[in-house]
Structure formats: C-alpha cells, structure tokens
C-alpha cells in the first residue's frame, strides 16, 4: 500500500484548525484504506495531498463531506465532531463540499436544475436561491446553455 503525503502550500498566521482527523481508519471490505490517520488543516491554509492511486486521497475528501463515514476515529470541522452528521446536514451547517475529479453534477438535470439542487441544500429562501442561480449563470456567461442536460455539456462548461 502506498503512502499519502500531506503538504502545506502556504501557511498563514491563523492556526485555528478548521478540519481535523484524529485516529481515523476506514476499510472497504477487508482492504484497509486509512489506518489511524491524523492531520489538521488550519484556517486560511492552502493544503494538498500527494500519493499513488488507491491510497485514500479521494476517500479523505469523501470523509470530510460525509459521503462516507469512518470505521474509527473522529473528524472535526471547526472543533465540532461531525462523524454522525448526514451529508446534507454537514454540507449546510459547515458550508463545505468539493467538486470531484470527474464532475459533481447530475447528468440528467439541466445546468439550471443542477444549481437548484445545490441551492436547495444551502439556501432556505427560494426567491434568493433563484436570484443567486441567475446571477451565477449570467456571471459565467451560461445563459444559452442553462436548460441543457449536464451530460450534453462540454468538459469546460461542466467545470464552470
């Protein structure tokens, strides 16, 4: 099994940890992926991870967002243990998420409805949500494709 090598690209004066892993372990079946992982990411810090395929880099992001849960250990966000928060509650309360390497969208929904799906998790006011969606569509010059299903968009359009 390979090793994940975390590194700090830029560290600022603020040392308040916003994400912390304490003795986190995870297995897929009989295969141990993470074994008592400990690290923290401080507020305003730029942080990265390097490692060969299959050592758990994407798994760590899935654990942070709550898409999967650890076998052992604690995951903390802003000092609060979040192991038992469901993904949608974690996303809403802590305003976290990430775009996976192969896209974070619903293929059969339009661009507009993909944004709406995210907005329904993070914004309580439907009028404000629609205003925000329209603002983003306009800002990224996507008006002419807002009703096209995500599976028909180019790679660059999906990234926007």
Where do the PLM segments sit?
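Q-loop/switch helix immediately C-terminal to the Walker
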Residues: 102, 108-121
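Conserved ABC ATPase signature
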Residues: 149-153
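ABC ATPase nucleotide-binding domain "signature motif"
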Residues: 154-160
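Helix-to-loop junction immediately C-terminal to a conserved catalytic motif
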Residues: 65
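Conserved ABC ATPase "signature" region
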Residues: 116, 127-145
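Conserved structural motif at the start of ABC-family nucleotide-binding domains
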Residues: 19-21, 34
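Conserved ABC transporter NBD signature motif
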Residues: 73-83, 91-94
């Amino acid at each position: 099994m390979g090793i994940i090598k975390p590194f700090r690209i830029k560290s600022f004066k603020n040392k308040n940890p916003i994400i912390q892993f304490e003795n986190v372990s995870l297995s897929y079946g009989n295969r141990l992926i993470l074994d008592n992982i400990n690290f923290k990411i401080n507020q305003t810090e730029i942080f990265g991870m390097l490692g060969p395929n299959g050592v758990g880099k994407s798994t760590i992001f899935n654990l942070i967002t709550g898409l999967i849960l650890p076998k052992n250990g604690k995951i903390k966000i802003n000092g609060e243990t979040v192991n038992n928060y469901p993904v949608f509650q974690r996303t809403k309360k802590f305003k976290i998420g990430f775009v996976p390497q192969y896209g974070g969208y619903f293929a059969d929904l339009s661009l507009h409805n993909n944004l709406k799906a995210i907005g329904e998790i993070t914004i309580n006011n439907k009028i404000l949500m629609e205003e925000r969606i329209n603002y983003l569509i306009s800002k990224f010059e996507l008006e002419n494709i807002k009703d096209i299903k995500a599976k028909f968009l180019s790679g660059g359009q999906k990234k926007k």
